[in-house]
UniProtKB/Swiss-Prot annotation:
The gene is MSRB3. A motif (Endoplasmic reticulum retention signal) lies at residues 187-190. This is Methionine-R-sulfoxide reductase B3. The active site is at residue 156. It comes from Pongo abelii. Its EC number is 1.8.4.12, 1.8.4.14. The keyword Signal applies.
Length: 190
């Protein structure tokens, strides 16, 4: 038998403590813009605590998760645009929302591929892909590859990370998204 090589016990403990400290410091940062220079819109924690509900702050800034089936938009079916609750960036159209049975609002596509940032998330001993607002870094939820066609994606988003702008008869919600409908495009060409 060959001798087994192990680290000296004090060195093992020190290494373990350093890894735990690094993990704790990494998870304590607000939002998903690790370096605020990467965020296009930056808010102070003080301002966010005043403006957001405790649940909205916990979800968007501390990467929390609201209870399943209890979010404001879980069963919401009105036409309109879902936006980031922190900065107002348009994220999802109501036409892409579907009932996944997961207990959280689910969408199969985003308004713009630039609206959301993806980050590997290894919390809770598993690998997932976190979704964050690319403008302000707010944690939104996660994306999975078990959604419906045409994308096969399921953006599983916390209601607390969203605000909603209803569509009205003039299509104002569509116009706010920066994405014109085909009917609006035709009118512009006339």
């Amino acid at each position: 038998m060959s001798p087994q090589r192990t680290l000296p016990r004090p060195l093992s403990l020190c290494l373990c403590l350093c890894l735990c400290l690094a993990a704790a410091l990494g998870s304590a940062q607000s939002g998903s813009c690790r370096d605020k220079k990467n965020c296009k819109v930056v808010f102070s924690q003080q301002e966010l605590r005043k403006r957001l509900t405790p649940l909205q702050y916990h979800v968007t800034q501390e990467k929390g998760t609201e209870s399943a089936f209890e979010g404001e938009y879980t069963h919401h079916k009105d036409p309109g645009i879902y936006k980031c609750v922190v900065c107002g960036t348009p994220l999802f159209k109501s036409e892409t929302k579907f009932d996944s049975g997961s207990g959280w609002p689910s969408f199969h596509d985003v308004i713009s591929s630039e609206a959301i940032t993806f980050t590997d998330d290894f919390s809770y001993g598993m690998h997932r892909v976190e979704t964050s607002c690319s403008q302000c870094g707010a944690h939104l939820g996660h994306i999975f590859d078990d959604g419906p066609r045409p994308t096969g994606k399921r953006y599983c988003i916390n209601s607390a990370a969203l605000s909603f702008t209803p569509a009205d008869s003039s299509g104002a919600a569509e116009g706010e998204s920066g994405v014109a409908s085909p009917a609006q495009a035709d009118k512009a060409e006339l």
